[in-house]
Amino acid sequence: MAQGTIPEWIQQLQQRDPKFAETVLTQREHVLKDGAIPAKYKILMTMIVDAITAHPDGCANIANRARAAGATEAEINEAVQVAYLFGGTPALVTAVNAFRASA
């Protein structure tokens, strides 16, 4: 998978329904690859969505995928600000998980 490690939820899906998991991963790769919008920005968009929908671990993991795709700390900082603008303080509290040190 080009975007980094496979998230735990996909690993669980792979164990229970490998064929469907492959479909999900194929679609994910197609959508998140470089195109008119560079992959790192698409990944930052997913981080914003995770912040707004209150997924702190996902936000941290996606931020690390964005870094691996070439996103700078300044870009991650601005994505956190966008999450706050559209999701309010709860999204900000979740979004700051993007600053967790990568493992």
Residue ranges of predicted features:
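C-terminal structural segments of small proteins and small subunits
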Residues: A74-A101
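Acidic, glycine/proline-rich low-complexity segments that act as flexible tails and inter-domain linkers
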Residues: M1-I43, N64-A68, T94-A103
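Residues at alpha-helix boundaries and short interhelical turns
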Residues: Q14, G35, I52-P56, G70, ...
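Mid-chain, well-packed structural core segment of small domains
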Residues: A54-V80
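Amphipathic, charged-and-aliphatic alpha-helical interface segments
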Residues: K42-P56
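Generic low-complexity, intrinsically disordered sequence content enriched
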Residues: D17, I48-A51, T89, V96
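Residues within well-ordered alpha-helical secondary structure of globular protein domains
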Residues: T26, I48, V82-L85
